[in-house]
Amino acid sequence: MHKDTPMSTVLKNFLPHLGRLVIVALLCSLVLGGWPRQGKAAQSVHSSYWLRSGIEQLEAGNYQQALQDFNQSIERENNLALAYSNRCLTQIYLQDYLHAWQDCTRSLQQQSDNYLAYFHRGLAFYRLGDYPQALTDYNQTIRLKPTYYQAYYNRGLVQATMKNHPLALADFNQSLRQITNWQPDALATIYNDRGLSHLALHNFTSAKADFNQALRLNKNNASAYYNLACTAHQLGEYERSIADLNRAIAIDPFYADAYIRRGLLRHQLGYYQSALADLNQGANHLYQQGLHHNYRQILALIEQIHQQLLSLPSPIV
């Protein structure tokens, strides 16, 4: 098929995915650094309740209740730096990135050396697409807390998003060096994302080594199998790519991109009926996940394949 057809256009939209530990890493920062210092906790027992309750609600995933509790804490002016910082994080979980940025800025006005506020604000900027400002905040986080592996990891994600893959590799390497406790899930995610930067630089051997290391650390890492499949696809190893996609789908039956890439591969190999089945399944998952633009792309591709099949003289597989 010609390189400018919708088939190749769709394939570009289902390249390997950058990791998603950015928010997960923040939970670690909340638990480890989110409590007031003991010297300040006795200022107001009543106000301290709202701050602690907000943190507990945030950890439990009750974001609206956490927001209300942090509002109460802020109204009582109890430990404003911490309350604003954690309300910033709550806004991030609620995908209200503008208010998150504002709250973290307020936190820093109260306490200019609050590395968590820089860290959280960096994520808000990242989600708003302001990558240079996100880098600035992660740089400041690292200046204040040089051993904070999450900051190196997040900065690496920003560099990778900006296609600065050599710099991303340096940050992922530093993140791995800074992890002092055995955290297999976090390690697996970092190896997986370092592998993506290697893959972007066509360092296929290093990419595969990182994806396999991610799987040794977490055998249920569907993303690592997907990325191995992408590597095999780029190397022209189509059957191996399909085998890795099969594993990814077995782990995550709702993995829309895995169905779609497998469908594209099967189409490429001439297995048209199974390709259509995969593309339809992937399209359904995209729709259910609210990714309507990609959903319409896949529907257009399915229609294109149907039209292509009508012109084939021989029975289809």
Per-segment meaning from a language model:
Residues H2-V317:
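Alpha-helical tetratricopeptide repeat
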